[in-house]
């Protein structure tokens, strides 16, 4: 489906998810992430680039585990995360849209919790190349976690937090030889 078609259908409220491909599990337990790292930061930065072509095969579970941990996993016993957020609000939730369903990443248990048994990739945005990517990460702000942040600042703080998470994803992807 082209980007223009998606925009038109979205404006009319007619953009719909596709049926799930396969059976979604209620919980996907992720293996421990590989936190050793393989490349120096400057090499990772030199490799970072975006593409519109993705392999159609699923990401191996150990790679997905490390990707999600890098994005917004817990890296301290006190619940601290790999990406910063203002006053530690941790207001961003990371969802993973697969062909068989959509999941919420739970950093505390390092697991994915099923939230929808449909293929939501085509309705997570308007870029047509995401429709068939092996997965799509979606960052959603939960304003109820931002009560200590002035209302006028919440949108910009949440955008900064989501940007930090996205940057972690880009850096991990470049270090692991993945495309974004």
Residue ranges and their predicted role:
Residues 48, 67, 94, 135-180:
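Small-aliphatic-rich amphipathic alpha-helix that forms the alpha element of a beta-alpha
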Residues 1-133:
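N-terminal amphipathic, basic helical "cap/leader" segment at the start of enzyme domains
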């Amino acid at each position: 489906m082209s980007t223009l078609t998606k925009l038109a259908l979205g404006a009319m409220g007619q953009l719909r998810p596709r049926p799930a491909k396969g059976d979604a599990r209620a919980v996907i337990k992720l293996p421990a992430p590989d936190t050793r790292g393989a490349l120096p930061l400057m090499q990772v930065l030199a490799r970072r680039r975006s593409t519109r072509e993705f392999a159609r095969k699923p990401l191996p579970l150990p790679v997905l585990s490390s990707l999600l941990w890098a994005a917004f996993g817990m890296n301290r016993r006190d619940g601290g995360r790999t990406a910063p957020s203002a006053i530690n609000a941790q207001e961003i939730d990371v969802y993973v849209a697969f062909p068989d369903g959509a999941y919420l990443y739970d950093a505390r248990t390092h697991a994915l919790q099923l939230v929808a048994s449909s293929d939501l990739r085509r309705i997570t945005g308007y870029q047509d190349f995401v429709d068939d990517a092996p997965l799509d990460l979606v960052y959603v702000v939960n304003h109820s976690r931002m009560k200590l942040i002035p209302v006028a600042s919440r949108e910009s703080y949440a955008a900064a937090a989501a940007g930090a998470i996205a940057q972690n994803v880009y850096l991990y992807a470049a270090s692991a030889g993945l495309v974004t």
